[in-house]
């Protein structure tokens, strides 16, 4: 499926399940849902998600190197100072591990680790370490929805990775007619759900 179809599906299901009652809650749900919808395709070479996590990994390495240099040159331990702020430290730990896992996921074959039950639960567990259900639940729902949608694809997914067996219902192609119809239907339903939610905000 195309990324816009995955996003539409993830947002529709997440919004329908969570039913946010505030503007910040709505934005958080959509943001976390969009991340969950797009993350599995980090393994698609040169995709937007792949390039994003390549840049994030480069930035992470740069920050680590700079921290070591600052410690060596000025005897300032940034790690220790950040650790004094326990909540911030825990968030940074989750984000750092998530970036590393996503970078490693980008180096696996398409529709393997990031499209598996194993990958789904590892990514969700990493987020759960620091973030609450306002973020974790829509992420989980959308990542799972992405996996289920790709099972419809003719090429299938390695749902039980690291086993190589690929599960496929062979009902459609990534950019075929079914994908276009699904995107249209999901988009219309998402708009309807958003209108219904907005009446309660």
Language-model segment annotations:
Residues 1-201:
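N-terminal membrane-targeting hydrophobic helices
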């Amino acid at each position: 499926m195309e990324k816009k179809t995955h996003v539409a599906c993830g947002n529709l299901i997440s919004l329908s399940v969570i039913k946010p009652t505030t503007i910040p809650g709505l934005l958080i749900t959509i943001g976390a849902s969009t991340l969950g919808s797009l993350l599995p395709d980090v393994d698609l070479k040169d995709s937007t998600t792949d390039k994003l996590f390549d840049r994030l990994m480069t930035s992470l390495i740069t920050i680590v190197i700079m921290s070591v240099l600052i410690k060596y040159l000025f005897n300032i331990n940034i790690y220790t100072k950040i650790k004094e702020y326990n909540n911030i430290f825990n968030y940074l730990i989750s984000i750092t591990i998530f970036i590393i896992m996503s970078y490693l996921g980008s180096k696996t074959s398409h529709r393997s680790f990031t499209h598996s039950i194993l990958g789904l639960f590892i990514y969700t567990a990493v987020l759960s370490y620091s973030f609450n259900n306002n973020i974790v639940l829509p992420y989980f729902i959308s990542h799972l929805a992405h996996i289920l949608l790709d099972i419809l694809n003719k090429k299938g997914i390695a749902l039980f990775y690291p086993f190589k067996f690929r599960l496929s219902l062979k009902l459609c192609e990534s950019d075929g007619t079914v994908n276009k119809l699904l995107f249209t239907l999901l988009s219309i339903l998402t708009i309807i759900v958003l209108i219904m939610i907005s009446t309660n905000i």
